[in-house]
Amino acid sequence: MVDLRRPDYDRPRVLRHVDLVLPLLTLAVALIGVVMVYSATRGPATDLRPAETFYLGRQARLVALGLVAMVVAGWYGHRRLHRFVPLVYVGMLGLLGAVLATGIEVRGARAWFQVGGLQFQPSEMGKVVLILALATWLGRTEEPSGPRVAVAVLLTAGPVGLIILQPDLGTVLVYGAIAAGMVLVAGVKGRHLFILGLLLVTGLVGVLESDVLEEYQVRRLLVFVDDDAETTASYNLEQAQVAIGNGGLTGRGLFQGTQNNSALVPEQQTDFIFTVVAEETGFVGGAVLLGLVGLLLFRVWRIGQMADDRFGLLVSAGVFSMLLFQVFQSVGMSTGIMPITGIPFPLVSYGGSSLLTTFVSVGLVQSVHMRRHERQGRA
């Protein structure tokens, strides 16, 4: 057994096992994001629009801060965080409750705190907290029992219920993907998976039938079901698909996208950032970006396989599930194969909360890799 109470923190020995591929891939994708955010937001300064380098500078600073956060997370270690999980989980629930009362509303969702000129979305960092909480709980046994799975469901349902009230359907789906991926890797029995599937379907139907979702969110889902629905969401999807089609094989050239420069695609620096990539760099550029993300995902999965305990394995599985679902959903809603739910492309979309969350998550996976020999060292 790994002694989580007194982990061995021999820094020189641990640093010898730093994985260089993981941060290099992460940085490469993030730098592509900086360029794409600049392309999506560039333009002359006016009374209504910041200078053309405003978003570029902010995104670059966020990437630099994210790199620091990734290093700190890897250095501090996932096992040290293990002991604080209950306290941090309760704190997350407190923040999610507080944002409903004191947060600001952005695009119909009360999900952000305003601190000076900065906005902070607690549900983003809550993804990391959920991963740690589920890894702690599910990692205690080789094959989680029914009661243990039930508690895992409750651990997920707590933050999900508060996020639904914001309402933020996209983040709810990400939390669900995290939980689903970790439950599968944890080795939950088939009958328990079946029950979880029924609960998931029932919950989704309940949310859709309730009055919790905003009207614009319902319209987005309606467009996915009915392509002929005449709504703002259908127009947005059409413009996104036109932008992707304009790119062709090699794209129109960096900063030369017609849909982009005409600002016809909504939220193109955040939710629809992939349309900027596809229009300006074409199929080739989109394939390169997705290829880099694929390599990053493969590395996260491989590190999970190398973990020397179930806690590290499940942390890696949670990060893998989070990134995979967000990339698939972000690209899918730009191309029309998935409903529009407002999920950012990890490391590429503009936004500090999402970017920092992803960097911290990768840092935790780095910690798993750095400490994969501790168990053998104490054997």
PLM ranges: what are they?
Residues L249-T281, A307:
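Long extracytoplasmic/lumenal interhelical loops at the membrane interface
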Residues R11-T26:
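N-terminal membrane topogenic signal
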